[in-house]
Amino acid sequence: ASLVGSEMCIRDRPKGTEHFLTDIHGEYEAFQHVLKNASGAVKRKVNEIFGNTLREAEKKEICTLIYYPEEKLQLVKAREKDLDDWYLITLNQLVKVCQNVSSKYTRSKVRKSLPAEFSYIIQELLHESSIEPNKHAYINVIISTIITTKRADDFIIAMCNLIQRLTIDSLHIVGDIYDRGPGAHIIMDTLCNYHNFDIQWGNHDILWMGAASGNDACIANVIRMSMRYANLVTLEDGYGINLLPLATFAMDTYADDPCTIFAPKMNFADGNYNEKTLRLITQMHKAITVIQFKLEAEIIDRRPEFGMQNRKLLDKIDFERGVFVYEGKEYPLRDTNFPTIDPADPYRLSDEERELIDKIHASFMNSEKLKKHMRCLFTYGGMYLVCNSNLLYHASMPLNEDGSFKHVRIGKKEYWGRKLLCKTDQLIRTAYFDEDGTEEKSFALDYVWYMWCGPNAPSFDKDKMATFERYFIGDKELSKETKGYYYTLRNRADICERILAEFEVTGPHSHIINGHVPVKIIKGEKPIKADGKLLVIDGGFSKAYQPETGIAGYTLVYHSHGLQLCLLYTSPSPRD
């Protein structure tokens, strides 16, 4: 009977807060700041607790201390004349906040979250009432002892970190940790040590998973994207990928080539590179791009069932005249220097290119940090998740024009809806974990690349990825990528209801939660669609998208009061 009663007590507790983030794209500072403040949940708690008993500036001070305790303590010490008095007041305030954020959880769960060094003391403080005079005196004795023994700083830091942890019960990353930004490896380090989280893989995550599995076309794409945005930190410092062979090859091959169209987008670079280094990055960018097109052609030829023959474009170049011939029309090329391409056999890798990609392949396969992070992605991730009447997936659900599920052939079978996401999930795992040398492994490896750019891939769902056209052709119409029907039909409530039913998610409070497509506020777009059945929360963390969206994106918080959509604004530094 006592066990039943205990279960009922746990069930009757307020709902733990869920935090949804998506499309972080390597922006680790913004990511860590949003984690620290729980998208405003900490501020809301502080306002609830102290109300009008504190001035706004005082409440802001408490919040800043909770977010960045080490930094804030240094500022306080330089300012305060009576530090012990500040310690006494602040520790009492932090105890109240900690009591509030821990009240949703059982004592057992809270105890498991406590820092070992201060576990007993924090338990005493959390479970004593400050209203009763005797208890209030007891709390003050504990706090005074902390101060007199010179442990106040350490204790404040421990309390602030505990508040951060208890404010969020579970974290959902709805895809795209990787790409563009300089700190995907730092984000993964944070997640590997996070107390409760899950990941719904995004297209950029899958690309990195393909690279870590040994797909050379994925490896080339990963490097190309890094060069495009001059973000080499994740590759070199994060994962120890040796780019020296690529640098040497690029300098030799394109020594007299300005490679103008391959100049990186410096607005989003991870450092201030000098002219010589930028020149080298530009050459490396061109070298790996040409290699990528050749490697992708190998997969396209090997897998005609992918239906991607129209993405083999090098053979449509008239190298003598410097034009691209497509569907009877000619387009002048923006770059006509191709020293590694044989016009008679344009997709054949030169001996030097093959040797280069073999070296880079080995570097990816031997990176221990990359292996650790990929294991984390596989352990805590998947193509979709159903949680508390919410269906989470990063990008798309392939649909026909009439809203029915699109049947996608994989191997000898067709898959659609939930079955399609389950099958692609299984293939991504097979590509990484299965032994080399089997046809199953070989097909899965190729399919991971298809998940990056294939027309019927739920992580992509466009008619093409116009990489070649964007680089070499100045025609916007030719570079246009047409999205699948999902991206327009998802505005209809009946379509969203059909998708939810496919995953056995029912009820008036069920939702689909997506990322992938930035919500362009400045163009009047809304994150809430289909009469509230679909929420698009592309985090907009990526600085590359912020000029287009007008904001730094959205996050979502789901607490005992309901769903709360949080608007993020840009800032020179999150700490500001």
Where is each model-derived feature located?
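Active-site loops and adjacent core secondary-structure elements that bind or stabilize anionic groups
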Residues: 8-9
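Low-complexity, serine/threonine/proline-enriched polar segments
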Residues: 62-113, 237-262, 422-480
